[in-house]
């Protein structure tokens, strides 16, 4: 299986004046096409920091992050942004949808950043994916008019609309009750499997983690046996 993402010897140190904190230490990780990986670990173990680095939203203090054979940390912000838009989808615990835009407009947004995609095409693709997450009756609703589970479905649709090869998800069901979390995760799994998208998910929920192909435990910034 080919590697979509490869991180080697990742170290992250936050420097705040006199105090410096090493958050990640010598981490390696390879994600191959279509696989589902769950990262678990106690609060403060570095899970979100790692996801940020892997998604090119921040740079490691040392080490390398390769996405589709290209070294992210040698790129400038514009180049990293283009790589994110082309290859990655992001889902967060709190949906990060834009309050003043409808479901369709929120989902179409990543496509509208691509000059080759017309507004009409972006809108149609947004409608198609919103249909596949069961929100055909909520297309013109704004986030404030949707339930928590529905908002998370919109966020999933937005992450998948560009057909990314990898979804980075930080507690994607963390603010939902048990039933909603199961249903939203079920939907996410079904779509990523149909679309052959890999999934790297941070979760506190070991039951959810058990559904992934591979589980990784982060403790104090390094891997431990799960
Ligand atoms: N920008 C920053 N500047 C300084 N320290 C930071 C910064 N971001 C995170 N940290 C510190 O890095 C450590 C790891 O944080 P991180 O958010 O990655 O943990 P986490 O495992 O995702 O925790 P949680 O499960 O609570 O979300 C924490 O001690 C945090 O205070």
From Swiss-Prot:
ATP binds at residues 41-48. Its main location: membrane. It is found in: Cell inner membrane. SUPFAM superfamilies: P-loop containing nucleoside triphosphate hydrolases. Its EC number is 7.6.2.-. Coiled coil: none annotated. GO terms for molecular function: ATP binding; ATP hydrolysis activity; transmembrane transporter activity. Pfam families: ABC_tran. It is a peripheral membrane protein. Residues 5-226 form the ABC transporter domain. Keywords: ATP-binding, Cell inner membrane, Cell membrane, Membrane, Nucleotide-binding, Translocase, Transport. GO terms for biological process: lipoprotein localization to outer membrane; protein localization to outer membrane. One of its GO terms (cellular component) is plasma membrane. The keyword Transport applies. Part of the ABC transporter complex LolCDE involved in the translocation of mature outer membrane-directed lipoproteins, from the inner membrane to the periplasmic chaperone, LolA. Responsible for the formation of the LolA-lipoprotein complex in an ATP-dependent manner. PANTHER family: IMPORT ATP-BINDING PROTEIN, LIPOPROTEIN-RELEASING SYSTEM ATP-BINDING PROTEIN LOLD. Belongs to the ABC transporter superfamily. Lipoprotein translocase (TC 3.A.1.125) family. The complex is composed of two ATP-binding proteins (LolD) and two transmembrane proteins (LolC and LolE). This is Lipoprotein-releasing system ATP-binding protein LolD.
């Amino acid at each position: 299986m080919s590697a979509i993402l490869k991180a080697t010897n990742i170290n992250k140190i936050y420097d705040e004046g006199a105090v410096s904190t090493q958050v990640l230490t010598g981490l390696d990780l390879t994600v191959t096409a279509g696989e589902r990986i769950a990262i678990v670990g106690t609060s403060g173990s570095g899970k979100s920091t790692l996801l940020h680095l892997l998604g090119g939203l921040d740079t490691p203090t040392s080490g390398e992050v390769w996405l589709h054979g290209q070294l992210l940390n040698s790129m400038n912000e514009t180049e990293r942004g283009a790589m994110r838009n082309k290859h990655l989808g992001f889902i967060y615990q709190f949906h990060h949808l834009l309050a003043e835009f409808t479901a369709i407009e929120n989902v179409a947004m990543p496509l509208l950043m691509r000059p080759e995609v017309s507004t009409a095409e972006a809108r149609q693709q947004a409608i198609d994916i919103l249909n596949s997450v069961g929100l055909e009756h909520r297309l013109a609703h704004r986030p404030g008019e949707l339930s928590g589970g529905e908002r998370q479905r919109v966020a999933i649709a937005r992450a998948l609309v560009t057909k990314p090869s990898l979804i980075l998800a930080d507690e994607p069901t963390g603010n939902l009750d048990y039933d909603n979390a199961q249903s939203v995760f079920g939907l996410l799994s079904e779509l990523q499997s149909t679309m052959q998208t890999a999934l790297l998910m941070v979760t506190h929920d070991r039951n959810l983690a058990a559904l992934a192909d591979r589980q990784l435990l982060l403790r104090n910034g390094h891997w431990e046996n799960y």
